[in-house]
Amino acid sequence: MLLYGDYHTHTTYSRHNHGKGSVLENASVAADKGLKQIAITDHGFNHEFFGIRRRQIPQLQEDILNAKEITGVDILLGVEANIISLDGEVDVKEEDYEFLDILLMGYHKCVHTSSMKDKALLCWANNFGNPFRPSKERLNRNTTAFLKALDKYPIDVITHLNYGFPTDTIAVAKMAKQKGVYVELNGKRICFTEEEIEIMTAEGVKFIVNSDAHRPERVGEVNNGMNLIYKYNIPLSQVVNIDKLPKFHKKRGN
């Protein structure tokens, strides 16, 4: 059982020293660990502190080409987009698709939202609310925002679902399956109940195991997800980057 690729890794393009290593360092570790492919998926453009800047994309593209040539690892350019409105907007524009090989989407606390209402009900309500016992209204708002995002954008992976942003897991997972989106088993945190894992598996939801590495040495470290696969007997046919390379939505020219 081999991990073919790690599709959630951060570099120094996640600003303010949030990501610790370069593209080349991430790729070198991936090569040493036998990975065939990785994605560089720094924080989205609207993150208040850690987001990559669009003006940095040409240099990132150059870094990726250089690292590919040196290491032989295939490297995808992506972003971990942020949900920024109750209406399911995320911080990517249509013109961004021209450089994106992969699009991840998740919730993060400190983002520039579309309006003050979105800041209050999306960010503040979740940042300061009880993460374990959300009100029905908050749960419904969060779930609806995710469902709308999945319907609007060519998202490939939902990252760390429910972390700081509780949702109706099964509703989101069913929509993800319908849209060909993978649910991440995150290398740092997995916020699912045993029942939710069993239902998602029975429903045929596709999973992807990623490290969420913020340091080069963490690239390819997916024991958290692998242990869950073993524990709940998730069929490997439902894990898209074990013993195979996953397919992602076509974005260029959309």
Which sequence ranges carry the predicted segments?
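Divalent metal-coordination and catalytic microenvironments
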Residues: 8, 30, 42, 75, ...
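Short, conserved active-site loops that position catalytic residues or coordinate cofactors/metal ions
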Residues: 6, 38-48
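Short, ordered loop/turn segments at secondary-structure junctions
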Residues: 43-44, 80, 188, 213
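Extended substrate/RNA-proximal surfaces in nucleic-acid metabolism proteins
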Residues: 50-178, 230, 238, 250-254
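Short, solvent-exposed loop/turn segments at secondary-structure boundaries
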Residues: 15-20, 49-54, 219-221
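Charged catalytic cores and adjacent phosphate/nucleic-acid-binding surfaces used
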Residues: 1-12, 23-24, 92-95, 115, ...
